[in-house]
UniProtKB/Swiss-Prot annotation:
Keywords: Cell membrane, Membrane, Transmembrane, Transmembrane helix. GO terms for cellular component: plasma membrane. Belongs to the UPF0324 family. This is UPF0324 membrane protein BR0028/BS1330_I0028. InterPro entries: UPF0324_pro (IPR018383). It comes from Brucella suis biovar 1 (strain 1330). Its main location: membrane. The lineage of its organism: Bacteria, Pseudomonadati, Pseudomonadota, Alphaproteobacteria, Hyphomicrobiales.
Length: 336
């Protein structure tokens, strides 16, 4: 990275770090006066970032640093998280859960597409919303768009809902733990099956427990890996008219997933010294909080209106359906 590029990202990165520091201080104040942190620093960072964006929108010079913090730092955090998980955890998950995840994705795409069509969304828009909701948000939308020949307006409108709904899910999903009496294991699986993006799983599960973080990330990674087969199916359905435009390998398998798996393999093979594991876990957590601050800075609440009522309603109903399907899978598998 050149000196000029570093200069370009410093304002946005600095603002994200400042919000992170404020969030961590507020968390400590909570702990001091309330006995515990009812809102974790991760959540506070999102709320503060969104408030800053809404009340005093940062100028263009902050954009590159905000994007850098929200994307690359969060991807690094996910990759580092692999160091806290061993391959035995994947084996213990069992084939039933893996096949169940695939089934949830398939059913969710079908239901979401049906909801979109019932609400009179165009075919391509309905496909984009369905894949974004059921697999991995913006990444799935971006990967699917060239396969089905979606227009840029369709992509922009489909992506608009993920910013707001993604944050809402991260903030509200932990409330289901006491409401539904979910165990840490059940909640981790639920988060992995419903949260849009891999990094957001960290934010949705960290306030609950480390076990929820680990299980949620594993489940979400399996869910993301469904993107390849789903794109292949839609490519076959769409025919040859879009065959000249194919998503690249890193759209189907993002680099941070490979990094996560590599770190997990190193941990499983005992190639990472136990003494540095706490430092790696802390670095992952800190980068995640910084990224959540940046995510909040990138959320424009007014984007929901620009996306259109039908798209928003489709996304909300699809998300509710996905939650119900996921809870059904957890019940069927007898997860305690």
């Amino acid at each position: 990275m050149t000196y000029s590029k570093i200069q370009n990202i410093l304002p946005g990165l600095g603002l994200s770090v400042a919000i992170t520091a404020a969030a961590m201080v507020l968390e400590k104040i909570e702990e001091h006066y309330a006995g515990r942190a009812w809102l974790e620093a991760l959540v506070i960072a999102i709320l503060l970032g969104t408030a800053v964006r809404s009340l005093a929108r940062p100028g263009p010079r902050f954009n590159k640093g905000i994007n850098f913090s929200a994307k690359l730092l969060l991807e690094i955090a996910v990759a580092l998280l692999g160091a806290s998980i061993s391959a035995s955890a994947v084996i213990e998950a069992g084939s039933g859960l893996i096949f169940g995840i695939a089934a949830v994705v398939a059913v969710a795409i079908t239901l979401s597409y049906g909801i979109g069509r019932l609400l009179k969304l165009p075919h391509r828009m309905a496909v984009l919303v369905a894949c974004g909701n059921s697999i991995c948000g913006n990444s799935a939308i971006a990967a699917m768009a060239p396969v089905i020949g979606a227009e840029s307006e369709d992509v922009a409108a489909s992506i608009a809902f993920t910013a707001i709904l993604g944050v809402i899910v991260v903030l509200t999903l932990p409330l289901l733990v006491p409401l539904l009496g979910l165990s840490f294991t059940q909640y981790g699986i639920l988060a992995g099956l419903t949260v849009y993006a891999v990094p957001q799983v960290l934010a949705a599960t960290a306030p609950v427990s480390l076990l929820s973080v680990q299980l949620g990330t594993l489940v979400k990674l399996v869910r993301v890996l469904m993107l390849g087969p789903v794109i292949l199916v839609f490519a076959l359905i769409s025919g040859n008219k879009n065959a000249d435009v194919k998503p690249g390998f890193f759209q189907l398998v993002p680099w941070f997933i490979i990094g996560f798996l590599a770190m997990m393999a190193l941990h499983s093979l005992h190639l990472i010294p136990e003494a540095i594991l706490p430092a790696i876990q802390y670095a992952s957590m800190l980068l995640t909080i910084i990224s959540m601050a940046a995510l909040g800075l990138g959320v424009d609440i007014r984007s929901v209106a620009s996306a259109g009522g039908r798209v928003t309603l489709t996304a909300i109903l699809s998300l509710i359906a996905l939650c119900c399907i996921s809870l059904g899978l957890i019940h069927m598998l007898g997860v305690a």
